[in-house]
């Protein structure tokens, strides 16, 4: 019975060595793998992710509405300008938009609502995936609601600047003299909050896929900025990081709407200043093939 002891000890030693070797290999493998969780950017806002989940729509087909098969096509009406007029109009439009700046000092002077109606109507002419028009523009005029919006945003923005955004981002913003204090959310007579609808609903209650919803709404935002500039108003593009869910509840918006952008709108205050920034010349932004 005793002669088996050395054999058992040897077997146990071999087993222990094998376990440690495999443990070392496992650790080396983990070190070589990309650290997706550790390196995840803390400033990525879930509300800003495009949610055109086509696979989910296919799997849950009974919950989703099929699109219309037939849409009437009509003759297209078009203004064909002479070349000189085209050049003139394009140059004038460029000069108008080249004056657009991000203005953080906005007066409390009231803006005609008809103008706001028109600029949002203009934004609604944007193209969209399968003509789903996946946007909702919430116009806030009530001072109490504006102040609640400011409170929510400043609470989250302080955390963003102190923790989420990181040293590099905060350093890059120093030259623009921005911080988490957003006084313009109180002073601007109008706040426009632009929501993307990640899906829609048909009359029968079934869901409708909104293809490329974030790209579509982003195009609408660009047109809205141009329309505001054309009307003689100023704004600053604001993307309230991690504020979407709270603002959605405050404004009574449904869960399938996600906040994409907030625009304070009004006239510049008398003491308004902007950074003396230069835009890239054409040869740095255009490539002709």
Swiss-Prot record:
Its EC number is 1.21.1.1. Its cofactor is FMN. Changing residue 116 to T: In TDH4; strongly reduces activity; marginally respond to the increase of flavin mononucleotide concentration; reduces protein stability. Residues 29-58 have a biased composition (Basic and acidic residues). Coiled coil: none annotated. Pfam families: Nitroreductase. This is Iodotyrosine deiodinase 1.
